[in-house]
UniProtKB/Swiss-Prot annotation:
The keyword Mitochondrion does not apply. Residues 87-122 are annotated as: Disordered. NCBIfam families: S16 (TIGR00002). The keyword Zinc does not apply. This is Small ribosomal subunit protein bS16. The gene is rpsP. InterPro entries: Ribosomal_bS16, Ribosomal_bS16_CS, Ribosomal_bS16_dom_sf. Keywords: Ribonucleoprotein, Ribosomal protein. GO terms for molecular function: structural constituent of ribosome. GO terms for biological process: translation. GO terms for cellular component: cytoplasm; small ribosomal subunit. Pfam families: Ribosomal_S16.
Length: 122
């Protein structure tokens, strides 16, 4: 399988990265199949070969998480909702529903407590 990943180069503590297409079993800094772009995290400079990237993505290349975020910022792929975000939103929705049910139960219990008290006094 072909992966789109970042290949590190530069001096110590001054890293820059090349965006490359390579086999998933190859080393991080091994020989790539194709160089597709450049990213410098210090200056936030990004250069992408959009035609080559679209071709590789259409062929089924899988980007790593870091590359995926660069491609999303570059507008080459749509932002995807990651499973953790989906689970978090689902749990939030369940908590809201459970909270609404608890509030309704408490209101019903409060009315039930008030009603028998009124009947015994009358």
């Amino acid at each position: 399988m072909i992966k789109l990943r970042l290949k590190r180069f530069g001096k110590k503590r001054e890293a820059s990265f090349r965006l490359v297409a390579c086999n998933s079993t190859s080393r991080r800094d091994g020989r790539p199949l194709q160089e597709l772009g450049f990213y410098n995290p210090r200056t936030k400079e990004t250069r992408l070969d959009t035609e080559a990237l679209r071709l590789r993505l259409s062929q089924g290349a899988q980007p790593t998480d870091a590359v995926r975020s660069l491609l999303e910022k570059g507008g080459l792929i749509e932002k995807t909702v990651r499973p953790a975000e989906v689970v978090g939103k689902a749990k939030q929705a369940e908590a809201r529903k459970a909270g609404a049910k608890n509030v309704a139960k408490q209101a019903a219990e409060a009315k039930a407590e008030e009603t028998p008290a009124d009947n015994t006094e009358a």
